[in-house]
A protein has these predicted regions:
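Glycine-rich phosphate/pyrophosphate-binding loop regions near the starts of catalytic domains
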Residues: 6, 14-149
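Generic N-terminal amphipathic, Lys/Arg-enriched alpha-helix
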Residues: 1-8
């Protein structure tokens, strides 16, 4: 790792992995962290061909857990809603998220809702956290081999 944090450490790539593996995980020394993922979703537009922010949030967190060798089981689903968002849009996004959770076999068990002033939220932000049971320990980028796909 470099001696200073740069934007590269937030990209989700090798530097993010190094940051997590070299600083964060050793500090907590808790195996359960290997099957816990948290993410925030801030996309525009909220609805797009093939999906929406709700489906993206659920599928993104489920994928993050699966990529760590875990079977996703439970999610939190928190909303930051901008004042003025049409309720029909919110209903479609939440219904889509529920359908994605059902399709993935996960339960949404908790969440939070906040409303921010008009002009301060880009419509809707979603934060999720997921917990899964580790089925394939040691599934890491370092363990990948040619032909694993």
């Amino acid at each position: 790792m470099d001696g200073i944090i740069t934007l590269d450490y937030g990209s989700g790539g090798r530097k993010t992995s190094a940051l997590i593996e070299e600083i964060i995980v050793p500090a907590f020394k808790n195996e359960a962290l290997s099957a816990f993922s948290s993410d925030s979703f801030v996309v525009t537009p909220l609805e797009f061909p093939g999906g929406d922010i709700g489906k993206l949030a659920v599928c993104g967190t489920v994928n993050d857990l699966a990529m760590c060798g875990a079977k996703p089981e439970y999610l939190s689903f928190s909303l930051i809603i901008e004042e003025g968002l049409p309720t029909d849009t919110l209903r479609r996004v939440v219904t889509s998220a529920a359908a994605a959770a059902k399709a993935a076999g996960v339960q949404i068990v908790t969440g939070d809702t906040k409303v921010v002033e008009r002009g301060r939220g880009d419509g809707l932000y979603i934060n999720t956290a997921g917990i899964g049971r580790i089925k394939y320990p040691g599934l890491t980028p370092a363990a990948m081999r040619a032909g694993d796909a």
